C-alpha cells in the first residue's frame, strides 16, 4: 500500500499517471480507479497525461467495473437487475402482503415513492456491507418487522428467479478472499484517484486486495501544513487529511508528500493559501497581487437570464481569442434551476454543450403514450386522457385535421366513458359529419377497445397482447417517422429512450412472466418504470462545452471555468437524509455493529465535504475562474455564498455586471442568433428612453452586422411598430359576402357587436366563426327555454287557472325534443332544469292577467328598411297593448338589463329603440297606434338578504319590486303605466325625445354600414375609462395588449351623471341637424 498526497496547486492525476506509466513499463498490469461521477473526465485526463496518450497495460475504470473484469468468466454468474427491475421485484413483494400484515407501511404498498425508497435502502445496505437483520436497532420494532418481512420476500423472489442478490463488488470481494483470483491479481497494481472516502463495501474490497495485488497506490489532496496539524476540524483539507490518516492507520503505512511537474498559476496558489489560513485558525494571509486578481472574478448579475447571457458572451469572446469549446467548463449551483435557461441561451449563441447528467424520460412522447394509456384504464376513459394518447403523435395514423375535428366533437358531445367511446356517435348530426367521425373513431379506438378488455392472466400473456396492440397502432413506425427528420443528436436520444423502454419490457417479462396480473397493475408497473427511468448521452464530439454540477468538479479540470448560481442556497450544498432510516438510527446501528459494515451519515460529512468541494472549485480552472451569482434566483432573492464572501474579503474582484453592457467592438455582439434575440427583446421593451452615446454606437455597429447577415439570407427587416393595422378585406370576398345589389342585413345584436369591437364583427359576421358549442345547456339554451315557456303560457287563452296554465306550459316545453335532450343528459342538466322551472314560476307572477294590459302578439318577426340600403331583421319576444290601445315591446332577458342612454349613444344598446322603430313603422297597420314604451323583463327568481328584512311582509313586497319592467317609456302614457309593474323613474321620454333616439339609432346603423361595406375593420375594443378595456379583445388572434395598445381602443363618450340624459339628447339632436345640413 502506498499513500500519496499533494497540495491543491499540483496535479494528483499527473503524479498517479506517472506512477502508472512506470509500472506499465516494468510489465505490471495497471487498473486506474476513479469515482463513478468522474470516470469519463478522469479517463480523458489520464490519457492526456500519458506520454504515449494510450497504453494497453493501463485500464481506467470504476470499482464496480473492476469487479466485472475479474469475475466475468466465473461460474454461477446470476442475472443482475437494474433499479427498474428491483422496483418491480419490490412491487411484486408488496403485492403479496394482505391488508393488515404490514403495520407501519401497509397503506404505502402501491406508492411509487415508497417503492423507490425501498430500492434505495436495498442498494444502500449492499454499499454499507450490512444485512437487513442489522436494522434491529431501529427505534420502532414494528418498522423493523415490516422491513424485515418485505426484504425476506424480496430475497425469496430473487432466489426463485435466479437473480443476483449481491452487488458485483461484494461478489468480487468474496472471490478475492477465497483465493480463486490470486494468480490474476499478483501481477496487478491498483491506482485509486479522486476519492476522499470509501464506502464500507469499497473499503472491504481494498482490504482484501491489499494482500494479493502487487501494490495499491491511493492519492489524495492535502497540504503538508494540514496533514501535520493536530486539529483538523474545519480545515479546508480535512476531508483529504482524515481519509489519509484513516488509511495510514488501517494499512500501517506512512503517506508520502509528492509534487507534480505541473503547477497552477501563482494567483490560484495565493488564493488557496489565504482560504486555508482562514480555516486552520492560523489567520495567515497573503495580499493578492494583480496575477491573483486575474485568476478569479466574482460577477453579480440581476437574474439567471442575465447571468447565463453574460457567460455565453464571455464564451464567444474566448472563441474569438482562439480557444476551443472543449477548453471551457460550466458548473451549476443548481442544475434543475438552470438547465432550461442555459439550454435556450446557449442555443441562441450557437454554443454546443454537453450536460454531464442522466436525463429523465418524463417529457418523451413514449412516456406520454404509456401515461395516457394507464390513465385511460384507471380513470375509465376520460376525454382528456384519450385525446392525450392520440396527440402523442405515435398512436395510429390520423391527419391533424381529422384529429382536430374529432376533438371538437368530443368536446361538443361531452364524450367520456368506455360506453360512449365504443359506440357510434349519434348526437349532433346537424353540426357534424357523423359518418366521418365514426370512421375516425373506429380506426383509433378499435385496437384500444380490444386491449382494455384484457382479463387478469399471466404477465407473459398480457405482455403479448400489449405487443400486439403496439403493432396495431403502429408505434415503432410512428416513432421512426417522428425522429426521421431530427438531428443526429436528437435521434440518439430517442434511440436511448427506446432502448430503455425495451429493457423495461424485458425486465417485466423476466420478473412477472408467470405472475397473474390485471391490466391496471400491468400498465401501472410499466408506467412507473418509464416515469422513473433515466438515460445518459455521450457527447457527439469532444469539442463541446461541458456542463455539470459544481460538486462533481475536480481540481484543474479545464482552462476556463464558469460557475453559475453560487448562492447561499446551493453553495454549499447541505445533504439531507430522505431515506427510511434516520441519522440517529444509522448511528445506533453503526455503534452496535462489530463488522466491517457501516452506514454513511452524510449530515456528519457535510462540513468537510463542502470545504473540499469549495477548494476544488476555486482551483478548477487552469487559467481563469469566474463565479457568478444572481440577485434573483427562481424569482426570489438569495444571499451570497459564505465561501464567496471569504473570497471577496481577501480581495478577489467583485463586479456588478447589471444589464448587458453595450460596447462598440464587433466581438461584443456575440453572434447572429444572439443579436437577433436581443433585437426582439428591445422590440418588446420600452424603446422611447434616451440612449447613451455608448449604446448608440453599439447599436449602429450591431445593425450593420445584422443587415449583412439578413441580406445574405434574403430576409428583410420588418418595421418595428406597436401598430395593430388590419388589412382591408378583398373586394371579391366583400362582394360574395355582401352582394352590391342587396341591402346590408343587420340586427341590433350585430350592431352591438360592431360597436363593441369592429374586428369582432369581422370574425363573427364576415368569417362566420362560432364559439365552441356543447350539448350541455348554457345561458343561451336557458334563455331559449324560458322564452318558450312564456310563449306557450301567453298563447293559452283557456279557462284554466294561471297556475295550471303555467304548469302546462312548463310540461309542454320539457317534452319538446330539443329541450328534452338538452336537460335529461345527466344530473347536472336535470338540476339546471329544476332551477329554470323555479325561475319560470317566479317570473310568471308578473305575467298574470292584468285588466290594463293584453298580449297583442309573441315572437313577432320584423324587417326594417333604412334608405333601402340596410335591412334590419329581428324577433320581438312580446308586444303588449294597454287599455288605451297603445303598444309596447317586451324583451325577455336572463340577466339584469336596463336602458342606458350613454351606452345607447355609443352604439352598445340599440335594441329597445330598434324595436320601437320597427313597430311604429309597421306597413301592415294603416293607423299607427301610439307606443307606450319598450322594456326588458329580467327572468329571475328574486333573492333577498334576510338580514335586511324586518318582517315577512316586506319580503313579499321586495320580491314583487324586483320583478318589474325596465326600459324607456312614453311620457304621454304615464297615467296608464303608473299603476302597472313598470319602473318609470328616469325612464320617461317625450315623443320628441323618442324621435331623437330613433334618428340617432338610424345614424348608428348607417355609420356601421359604411364601415362594413368598406371592408376595413379596426381592432378597437371599447374602453369606458381609458385605463381598462371593456370590449372583447381576442388577444390570441389580434395580439391586443391593453398596456401597449390602449390608444387603439375606442373611448366611449361620457357625461356626468347629472347631465347624462339631457346632454346626450342634445348631442343627438345637434348631430341630426348637422347631418341634415
UniProtKB/Swiss-Prot annotation:
Its cofactor is Mg(2+). One of its GO terms (biological process) is double-strand break repair via homologous recombination. Pfam families: ADDB_N (PF21445), PDDEXK_1 (PF12705). It is an enzyme of class 3 (hydrolase). GO terms for molecular function: 5'-3' exonuclease activity; ATP binding; double-stranded DNA binding; helicase activity; hydrolase activity, acting on acid anhydrides. Its EC number is 3.1.-.-. Keywords: ATP-binding, DNA damage, DNA repair, DNA-binding, Exonuclease, Helicase, Hydrolase, Nuclease, Nucleotide-binding. Despite having helicase-like domains, this subunit does not have helicase activity. PANTHER family: RECBCD ENZYME SUBUNIT RECC. The heterodimer acts as both an ATP-dependent DNA helicase and an ATP-dependent, dual-direction single-stranded exonuclease. Recognizes the chi site generating a DNA molecule suitable for the initiation of homologous recombination. This subunit has 5' -> 3' nuclease activity but not helicase activity. Belongs to the helicase family. AddB/RexB type 2 subfamily. Heterodimer of AddA and RexB. HAMAP family: AddB_type2 (MF_01453). NCBIfam families: rexB_recomb. This is ATP-dependent helicase/deoxyribonuclease subunit B. It comes from Streptococcus agalactiae serotype V (strain ATCC BAA-611 / 2603 V/R). The gene is rexB.
Amino acid at each position: 500500500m502506498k499513500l500519496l498526497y499533494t497540495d491543491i496547486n499540483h496535479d494528483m492525476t499527473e503524479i498517479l499517471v506517472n506512477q502508472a506509466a512506470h509500472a506499465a513499463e516494468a510489465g505490471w498490469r495497471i487498473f486506474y480507479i476513479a469515482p463513478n461521477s468522474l470516470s469519463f473526465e478522469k479517463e480523458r485526463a489520464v490519457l492526456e497525461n500519458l506520454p504515449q496518450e494510450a497504453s494497453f497495460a493501463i485500464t481506467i475504470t470504476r470499482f464496480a467495473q473492476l469487479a466485472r473484469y475479474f469475475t466475468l468468466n466465473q461460474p454461477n454468474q446470476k442475472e443482475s437487475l437494474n433499479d427498474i427491475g428491483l422496483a418491480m421485484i419490490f412491487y411484486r413483494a408488496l403485492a403479496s402482503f394482505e391488508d393488515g400484515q404490514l403495520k407501519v407501511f401497509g397503506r404505502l404498498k402501491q406508492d411509487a415513492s415508497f417503492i423507490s425508497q425501498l430500492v434505495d435502502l436495498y442498494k444502500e445496505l449492499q454499499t454499507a456491507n450490512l444485512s437487513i437483520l442489522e436494522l434491529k436497532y431501529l427505534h420502532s420494532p414494528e418498522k423493523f418487522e415490516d422491513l424485515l418481512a418485505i426484504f425476506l420476500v424480496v430475497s425469496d423472489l430473487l432466489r426463485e428467479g435466479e437473480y443476483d442478490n449481491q452487488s458485483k463488488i461484494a461478489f468480487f470481494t468474496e472471490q478475492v478472499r477465497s483465493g480463486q483470483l490470486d494468480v490474476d491479481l499478483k501481477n496487478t497494481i491498483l491506482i485509486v484517484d479522486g476519492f476522499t472516502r470509501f464506502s464500507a463495501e469499497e473499503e472491504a474490497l481494498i482490504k482484501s486486495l491489499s494482500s494479493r495485488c502487487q501494490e495499491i497506490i491511493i492519492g489524495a489532496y492535502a497540504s503538508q501544513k494540514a496533514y501535520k496539524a493536530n486539529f483538523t476540524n474545519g480545515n479546508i483539507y480535512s476531508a483529504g487529511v482524515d481519509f489519509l490518516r484513516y488509511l495510514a492507520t488501517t494499512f500501517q503505512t506512512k503517506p508520502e508528500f509528492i509534487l507534480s511537474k505541473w503547477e497552477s498559476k501563482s494567483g490560484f496558489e495565493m488564493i488557496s493559501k489565504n482560504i486555508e489560513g482562514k480555516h486552520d485558525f492560523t489567520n495567515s494571509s497573503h495580499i493578492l497581487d494583480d496575477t491573483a486578481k486575474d485568476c478569479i472574478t466574482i460577477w453579480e448579475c440581476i437574474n439567471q437570464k442575465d447571468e447565463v447571457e453574460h457567460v455565453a458572451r464571455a464564451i464567444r469572446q474566448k472563441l474569438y481569442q482562439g480557444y476551443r469549446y472543449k477548453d471551457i467548463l460550466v458548473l451549476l449551483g443548481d442544475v434543475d434551476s438552470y438547465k432550461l435557461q442555459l439550454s435556450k441561451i446557449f442555443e441562441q449563441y450557437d454554443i454546443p454543450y454537453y450536460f454531464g447528467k442522466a436525463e429523465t424520460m418524463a417529457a418523451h412522447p413514449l412516456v406520454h403514450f404509456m401515461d395516457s394509456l394507464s390513465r385511460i384504464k384507471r380513470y375509465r376513459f376520460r376525454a382528456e386522457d384519450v385525446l392525450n394518447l392520440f396527440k402523442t403523435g405515435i398512436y395510429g395514423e390520423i391527419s391533424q385535421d381529422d384529429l382536430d375535428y374529432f376533438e371538437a366533437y368530443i368536446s361538443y358531445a361531452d364524450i367520456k366513458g368506455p360506453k360512449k367511446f365504443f359506440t357510434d356517435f349519434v348526437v349532433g348530426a346537424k353540426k357534424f359529419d357523423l359518418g366521418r367521425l365514426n370512421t375516425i373513431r373506429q380506426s383509433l379506438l378499435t385496437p384500444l377497445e380490444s386491449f382494455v378488455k384484457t382479463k387478469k392472466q399471466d404477465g407473459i400473456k398480457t405482455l403479448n397482447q400489449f405487443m400486439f396492440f403496439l403493432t396495431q397502432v403502429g408505434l415503432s413506425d410512428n416513432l421512426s417517422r417522428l425522429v426521421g427528420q431530427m438531428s443526429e443528436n436528437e435521434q440518439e436520444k430517442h434511440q436511448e429512450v427506446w432502448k430503455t423502454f425495451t429493457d423495461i419490457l424485458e425486465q417485466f417479462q423476466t420478473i412477472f412472466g408467470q405472475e397473474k396480473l390485471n391490466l391496471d397493475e400491468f400498465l401501472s408497473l410499466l408506467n412507473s418504470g418509464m416515469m422513473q427511468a433515466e438515460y445518459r448521452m455521450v457527447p457527439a464530439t469532444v469539442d463541446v462545452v461541458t456542463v455539470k454540477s459544481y460538486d462533481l468538479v475536480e481540481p484543474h479540470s479545464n482552462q476556463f471555468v464558469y460557475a453559475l448560481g453560487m448562492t447561499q442556497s446551493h453553495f454549499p450544498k447541505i445533504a439531507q437524509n430522505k431515506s427510511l432510516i434516520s441519522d440517529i438510527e444509522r448511528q445506533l446501528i453503526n455503534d452496535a455493529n462489530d463488522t466491517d459494515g457501516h452506514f454513511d451519515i452524510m449530515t456528519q460529512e457535510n462540513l468537510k465535504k463542502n470545504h473540499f468541494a469549495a477548494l476544488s472549485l476555486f482551483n478548477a480552472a487552469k487559467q481563469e475562474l469566474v463565479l457568478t451569482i444572481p440577485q434573483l434566483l427562481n424569482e426570489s432573492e438569495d444571499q451570497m455564498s459564505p465561501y464567496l464572501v471569504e473570497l471577496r474579503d481577501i480581495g478577489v474582484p467583485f463586479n456588478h455586471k447589471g444589464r448587458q453592457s453595450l460596447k462598440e467592438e464587433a466581438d461584443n455582439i456575440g453572434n447572429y442568433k444572439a443579436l437577433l434575440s436581443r433585437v426582439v427583446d428591445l422590440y418588446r421593451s420600452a424603446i422611447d428612453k434616451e440612449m447613451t452615446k455608448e449604446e448608440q454606437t453599439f447599436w449602429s455597429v450591431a445593425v450593420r452586422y445584422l443587415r449583412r447577415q439578413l441580406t445574405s439570407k434574403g430576409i428583410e427587416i420588418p418595421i418595428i411598430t406597436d401598430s395593430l393595422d388590419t388589412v382591408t378585406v378583398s373586394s371579391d370576398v366583400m362582394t360574395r359576402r355582401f352582394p352590391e345589389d342587396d341591402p346590408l342585413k343587420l340586427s341590433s345584436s350585430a350592431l352591438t357587436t360592431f360597436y363593441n369591437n369592429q374586428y369582432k364583427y369581422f370574425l363573427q359576421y364576415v368569417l362566420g366563426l362560432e364559439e365552441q358549442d356543447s350539448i350541455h345547456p348554457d345561458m343561451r339554451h336557458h334563455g331559449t327555454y324560458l322564452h318558450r315557456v312564456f310563449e306557450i303560457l301567453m298563447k293559452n287563452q283557456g279557462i284554466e287557472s294561471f297556475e295550471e296554465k303555467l304548469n302546462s306550459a312548463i310540461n309542454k316545453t320539457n317534452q319538446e325534443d330539443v329541450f328534452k335532450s338538452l336537460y335529461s343528459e345527466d344530473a347536472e342538466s336535470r338540476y339546471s332544469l329544476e332551477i329554470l322551472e323555479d325561475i319560470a314560476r317566479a317570473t310568471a307572477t308578473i305575467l298574470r292577467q292584468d285588466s290594463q294590459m293584453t298580449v297583442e302578439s309573441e315572437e313577432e318577426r320584423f324587417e326594417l328598411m333604412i334608405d333601402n340600403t340596410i335591412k334590419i331583421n329581428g324577433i320581438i319576444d312580446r308586444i303588449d297593448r294597454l287599455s288605451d290601445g297603445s303598444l309596447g315591446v317586451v324583451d325577455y332577458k336572463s340577466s339584469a338589463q336596463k336602458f342606458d342612454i350613454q351606452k345607447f349613444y355609443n352604439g352598445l344598446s340599440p335594441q329597445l329603440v330598434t324595436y320601437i322603430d320597427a313597430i311604429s313603422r309597421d306597413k301592415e297597420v294603416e293607423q299607427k297606434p301610439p307606443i307606450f314604451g319598450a322594456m326588458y323583463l329580467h327572468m329571475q327568481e328574486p333573492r333577498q338578504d334576510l338580514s335586511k328584512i324586518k318582517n315577512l311582509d316586506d319580503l313579499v313586497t321586495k320580491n314583487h319590486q324586483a320583478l318589474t319592467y325596465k326600459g324607456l317609456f312614453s311620457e304621454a302614457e304615464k297615467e296608464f303605466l303608473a299603476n302597472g309593474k313598470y319602473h318609470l323613474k328616469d325612464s320617461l321620454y317625450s315623443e320628441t325625445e323618442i324621435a331623437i333616439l330613433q334618428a340617432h339609432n338610424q345614424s348608428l346603423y348607417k355609420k356601421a354600414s359604411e364601415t362594413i361595406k368598406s371592408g376595413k375593420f379596426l381592432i378597437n375594443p371599447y374602453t369606458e375609462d381609458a385605463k381598462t378595456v371593456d370590449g372583447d379583445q381576442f388577444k390570441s388572434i389580434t395580439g391586443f395588449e391593453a398596456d401597449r395598445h390602449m390608444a387603439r381602443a375606442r373611448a366611449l363618450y361620457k357625461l356626468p351623471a347629472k347631465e347624462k340624459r339631457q346632454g346626450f339628447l342634445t348631442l343627438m339632436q345637434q348631430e341630426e341637424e348637422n347631418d341634415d345640413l
